[in-house]
Amino acid sequence: MVKSRHSFFGSFSLNTVRIIGGEWRRRVLRFPDAQGLRPTPDRVRETLFNWLGQDLDGLSCLDLFAGSGALGFEAASRGAAKVVMVEHAPKVAAALEENARLLAAGGRLQIVRADAVKFASSLSATGARFDVLILDPPYKQGWIERLAPLLPQLLANDGALYVEAEYPIETIDACGDWKSVRSGRAGQVFYQLLRRTQHDGA
């Protein structure tokens, strides 16, 4: 098995990111270079999971731009019962699958090779809803605007929407009653947590 692992990760240039909390704390994730792929910095990840609560026990999460897997694996490490990670780039998706295998993640993690909008559209038609939805798309490609009409059908009523973008997001108009309840900035990256208006203060 060790030989197989080295053969897979030895086939392209690798970057690494470390899981910072939970069951897999300090475990290293390996991933290839890809256009638009930017792992969420440790400090930002720590802030996000402080917002969500360190223990995600029993929650379901959907990461539509999984990339390095930093956020999706972190959610699973912190107890999420189900994490669906969507990635379109074949090499990046293959690295996610290999990292999941090395972590012995089992049924908690589902890696999907697909276009984010097409997958979200097909998923919304099934009635599936998630407690946490993560959007960290490549910049300046209009992904958030294209996905916005689908988001209300993918999130539970009391769910949380986490967005990273190159600009601040207070609301997403096509989502209706969603607005930012937490926000921060790290360099040129704006990150925010949005919830339905009627759940503010809950």
Per-range role (PLM):
Residues M1-A202:
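Class I S-adenosyl-L-methionine-dependent methyltransferase catalytic core
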